[in-house]
UniProtKB/Swiss-Prot annotation:
UniProt keyword terms in alphabetical order: Manganese, Metal-binding, Mitochondrion, Oxidoreductase
InterPro entries on file: Fe/Mn_Superoxide_Dismutase, Mn/Fe_SOD, Mn/Fe_SOD_C, Mn/Fe_SOD_N, Mn/Fe_SOD_N_sf, SOD_C_sf
Protein name per Swiss-Prot or TrEMBL: Superoxide dismutase [Mn], mitochondrial
One Pfam short name: Sod_Fe_C
Functional note: Destroys superoxide anion radicals which are normally produced within the cells and which are toxic to biological systems.
Reaction equation(s) it catalyzes: 2 superoxide + 2 H(+) = H2O2 + O2
Leading EC class: oxidoreductase
Source organism phylogeny: Eukaryota, Metazoa, Chordata, Craniata, Vertebrata
Record-stated family: Belongs to the iron/manganese superoxide dismutase family.
Cofactors that this protein relies on: Mn(2+)
Organism, as annotated: Petromyzon marinus (Sea lamprey)
Length: 144
């Protein structure tokens, strides 16, 4: 269970700030491109990565939530979890361990590896987006 206060904070403060700051950075980038100012374009990349990543990560996070959520998955996802981790409980344990090990701010992720056709667990620092950082397709994110 995640409290309403935590969800409100994540939506109204964190996610909204990432979107607003990304919009500002994209506007500055457009101006730099129009001027041919490559130095400014390069200088804006960290802000675009951080705020764009925060927007992407939180957008995925919202899709992972449900008022009636919880419990083990069924169907193809259940089969993939059992194949790649042994059981849903083992997946939970590994996800928790990887997420807790993140130093400072970051994300624990369950992702799909298109090259191997397998599920993998990964962590990303700060707001680094999973797919851009690891190539994995994000399925479930834990904000830490």
């Amino acid at each position: 269970h995640i409290s309403a206060n935590i969800m409100q904070l994540h939506h109204s403060k964190h996610h909204a700030t990432y979107v607003n700051n990304l919009n500002v950075a994209e506007q500055k980038l457009a101006e730099a491109v129009a001027k041919g100012d490559v130095t400014a374009e390069i200088a804006l990349q960290p802000a675009i990565k951080f705020n764009g990543g925060g927007h992407i990560n939180h957008s995925i996070f919202w899709t992972n939530l449900s008022p009636n959520g919880g419990g083990a998955p069924t169907g193809d996802l259940q089969k993939a979890i059992e194949t790649d981790f042994g059981s849903f409980t083992k997946l939970q344990e590994k996800m928790s361990a990887v997420s807790v090990a993140v130093q400072g701010s970051g994300w624990g992720w369950l992702g799909y590896d298109k090259e191997t056709g397998r599920l993998r667990i990964a962590a990303c620092a700060n707001q680094d987006p999973l797919q851009a950082t690891t190539g994995l397709i994000p399925l479930l994110g834990i904000d830490v």
